[in-house]
Amino acid sequence: MDTGGNSLASGPDGVKRKVCYFYDPEVGNYYYGQGHPMKPHRIRMTHALLAHYGLLQHMQVLKPFPARDRDLCRFHADDYVSFLRSITPETQQDQIRQLKRFNVGEDCPVFDGLYSFCQTYAGGSVGGSVKLNHGLCDIAINWAGGLHHAKKCEASGFCYVNDIVLAILELLKQHERVLYVDIDIHHGDGVEEAFYATDRVMTVSFHKFGDYFPGTGHIQDIGYGSGKYYSLNVPLDDGIDDESYHLLFKPIMGKVMEIFRPGAVVLQCGADSLSGDRLGCFNLSIKGHAECVKFMRSFNVPLLLLGGGGYTIRNVARCWCYETGVALGVEVEDKMPEHEYYEYFGPDYTLHVAPSNMENKNSRQMLEEIRNDLLHNLSKLQHAPSVPFQERPPDTETPEVDEDQEDGDKRWDPDSDMDVDDDRKPIPSRVKREAVEPDTKDKDGLKGIMERGKGCEVEVDESGSTKVTGVNPVGVEEASVKMEEEGTNKGGAEQAFPPKT
């Protein structure tokens, strides 16, 4: 395989990309609890595939700097962050009122190392934004991120801290406009809610709509005030396949890119929209899912790739490995190399899994109506919004560890985490693990449909600074330390937004 340093030739556009990949070896150790479908171990499985396919050698591999309290409080309420920092399995019985207040308990359980987990995945997403802002990479990847349901004042849908909102706020320091695209099967409600009233962030969510968590994302939810028409929702039904999905995705996203002209794109790649997902009901193949990544990559705009949902974890690892290859411009072989988790992928031991023969309930007429309605809404946006020339806010401090000095294929330690999947027996470890559980499907999506949080918004001013409004509003503390990169300050914290051309 011919490399180009950290940058490989892409597909049809022929343009090279430099890719930064954020990974913390300890992220797979966190454990939501017995029977819970969210398994951070899937991130370690993904990393193992990347190592054995040789993809780590073609990226800059970085260990994220943990997000600090003040970083998280750029969006989240300070008392909520304080609660996450202090709560433990041993003390939770003494904080019943707080657990209810912040919606922590069942879907979002308290577990050992909860706050460190939040700091880790949020740090990777914010770190990716900083790298993109400084032009140090073209694509940044954090598969541990993408937890799109978390609200300002509460946890929701397995998500505690909304790393996506934090990453977008960081990107807004450099870019006038940021586009958020969500291909998770669940509506990206937390991100939409945060930016519902601003025209500097456009949110586009392709999701299952109906009696399904979180119950939001109607096609008529289009934004409010200056954000009107800057929220796009694409409601889909069970069984949508690759062809049907891209009848909507490509024309809609093509028009969005033409009209909105974002300076950066954040793509949440939730893998629960794949065929056969434990909590999902779509019928996308891995190649069909990855086609969305390939399409957004083709616009040559700084791109942040994040994870998200995905509960048949062997397929999650397959998907994100393949999509890492797409980001690099490498066609990853279907035949899987032998590695620590090889037995999980039997009996075929291949990267790709055939879609099922489930019924596609999305008729051609329905898809055309959705496409026409959304294109009509986009036609009401005459031009991309701009902001006045302003001083650029300082960068968030992200002194991540560059691991490129080591052999990329040997960076992962298979002994530091449990070898457990939906259908595997646990191996003893320093982290308590659950027993084997069946790979059953939950037709309602996530366990326990919860009422959507109301009244919390992020107001973004022209400089990229933010103010959170709603329940228990708090002041926003900006990070004040400039990022030092290889002994020099690249990009300069004093840079201002360029004037609109």
Curated annotation (Swiss-Prot):
Question: Keyword set for this entry?
Answer: Chromatin regulator, Hydrolase, Metal-binding, Nucleus, Phosphoprotein, Repressor, Transcription, Transcription regulation, Zinc
Q: Where are the disulfide bridges?
A: none
Q: Where is the composition biased (Basic and acidic residues)?
A: 422-457, 479-488
Record's note on what induces expression: Induced by jasmonic acid, ethylene, wounding and pathogen infection. Inhibited by sodium butyrate.
Cite the InterPro entries for this sequence.
HDAC_PDAC (IPR050284), His_deacetylse (IPR000286), His_deacetylse_1 (IPR003084), His_deacetylse_dom (IPR023801), His_deacetylse_dom_sf (IPR037138), Ureohydrolase_dom_sf (IPR023696)
- Molecular-function annotations in GO: histone deacetylase activity; histone deacetylase activity, hydrolytic mechanism; zinc ion binding
The Enzyme Commission number assigned here is 3.5.1.98
What does UniProt give as GO cellular component? histone deacetylase complex; nucleus
Residues noted as binding Zn(2+) in the record, renumbered to the chain = 184, 186, 272
* Residue ranges, annotated region (Disordered): 383-501
Q: In the UniProt entry, which residues are flagged as the active site?
A: 149 (proton donor/acceptor)
Name the top EC class.
hydrolase
Query: In its keyword annotation, does this UniProt entry include Signal?
Result: no
Q: Where is the composition biased (Acidic residues)?
A: 397-407
Q: Which reaction does it catalyse?
A: N(6)-acetyl-L-lysyl-[histone] + H2O = L-lysyl-[histone] + acetate
- Quote the cofactor binding remark: Binds 1 zinc ion per subunit.
Q: Into which family does the record put it?
A: Belongs to the histone deacetylase family. HD type 1 subfamily.
Q: What else is known?
A: Loss-of-function mutant (antisense inhibition) has an increased level of tetraacetylated histone H4 and shows late flowering, developmental pleiotropy and increased symptoms when infected by a pathogen.
The protein's name:
Histone deacetylase 19
Species this protein is from: Arabidopsis thaliana (Mouse-ear cress)
> What's the name of its gene?
HDA19
